[in-house]
């Protein structure tokens, strides 16, 4: 036990060092905010403004009790105390191009004006191309090429907008197709502006057309065609309505002819209504085909026949003992009563 104590005391006597009073340095207070910064710099070589080899050699002698290097120049290089802050002066801290492209583009980003879609319609583009040509006429392929040379936007999706160009040339009267002359061989016809379509755009501004150009001949032809169709339509309607009117209109009864005095003191009205001879004079002059010939004359004395419904004179109510020849009805049958009733009610309603 004593030996171990002696050995510990011996070790302490050998390894302990007590400096003299003149060799003691003044104490240096460390900066609390820069301590974690220096430790971070030593661990992360990418964010350090110094080469990977470490800090540059200090002019002061390095010793076990040497004061730390001044941290004043490190402040401006790390204003944000971040990974990429203050690294613009060194190539080690600059982010690579992949990091920049990997980020999302800002919301206010727009493509360059040279590649933006021009604010012109297809008719305006065709008009500009034709007016810029020396001969004031261009083929379809030349119009395509002129548009692509002037506006880089139309160098993509060519099939889509070229179809629109063809439709605009075909369905607008302001563009005229000109055949090739023999001295200018080639493929495709020329397209030119109509001579009367010079005022489509106001003061040479192609952003919007002042008015749509239409040929007056087509308008006149369209109006005359509509007029002829209306005339034909009215004429045909009149022609179709005429036979209907003739069919539906009842024949006008002739003035009543004097009839002989009835025998046995019977009423004349009852004889007129009951006898079939009273309706036969109306149709004696008509020559009907064999299919339309009327076999029995009693059909015109039906309670709902045209003669009974449209006659001006209301027949007197017949006696109950008088029957119809064709029907063979007895005197007390209710059909006789309904005949006079319906004829009077329809006449009053009209």
Curated annotation (Swiss-Prot):
Annotated Gene Ontology MF terms? DNA-binding transcription factor activity; DNA-binding transcription factor activity, RNA polymerase II-specific; protein domain specific binding; RNA polymerase II cis-regulatory region sequence-specific DNA binding; sequence-specific double-stranded DNA binding; transcription cis-regulatory region binding
Region listing for Disordered, in residue ranges: 217-276
Q: What keywords are assigned to this protein?
A: Activator, Chromatin regulator, Developmental protein, Differentiation, DNA-binding, Nucleus, Spermatogenesis, Transcription, Transcription regulation
| Signal sequence coordinates | none
| Bias-annotated ranges (Pro residues) | 250-259
What SMART domains has UniProt attached to this entry?
FH (SM00339)
| Compartment(s) where it occurs, according to its Swiss-Prot or TrEMBL record | Nucleus
Q: What InterPro entries would the database entry show?
A: FH_FOXA3, Fork-head_N, Fork_head_dom, FOX_domain-containing, TF_fork_head_CS_1, TF_fork_head_CS_2, WH-like_DNA-bd_sf, WH_DNA-bd_sf
DNA-binding region positions on the chain? 116-207
SUPFAM superfamilies noted in UniProt: Winged helix' DNA-binding domain
GO cellular component terms, semicolon-separated: actin cytoskeleton; chromatin; nucleoplasm; nucleus
Q: In which tissues is it expressed?
A: Expressed in erythroleukemia and hepatoma cell lines and in liver and pancreas. Not expressed in any other cell lines or tissues examined.
A Pfam family in this protein? Forkhead
Q: Which GO terms describe its biological process?
A: anatomical structure morphogenesis; cell differentiation; cellular response to starvation; chromatin organization; hematopoietic stem cell homeostasis; intracellular glucose homeostasis; positive regulation of transcription by RNA polymerase II; regulation of transcription by RNA polymerase II
Query: Where does this protein have compositionally biased stretches of type Low complexity?
Result: 226-249
- What subunit structure does UniProt give? Interacts with FOXA2.
Q: Say what the protein does.
A: Transcription factor that is thought to act as a 'pioneer' factor opening the compacted chromatin for other proteins through interactions with nucleosomal core histones and thereby replacing linker histones at target enhancer and/or promoter sites. Originally described as a transcription activator for a number of liver genes such as AFP, albumin, tyrosine aminotransferase, PEPCK, etc. Interacts with the cis-acting regulatory regions of these genes. Involved in glucose homeostasis; binds to and activates transcription from the G6PC1 promoter.
Annotated protein name in UniProt: Hepatocyte nuclear factor 3-gamma
Organism whose genome encodes this protein: Homo sapiens (Human)
Organism phylogeny: Eukaryota, Metazoa, Chordata, Craniata, Vertebrata
Q: Which gene encodes it?
A: FOXA3
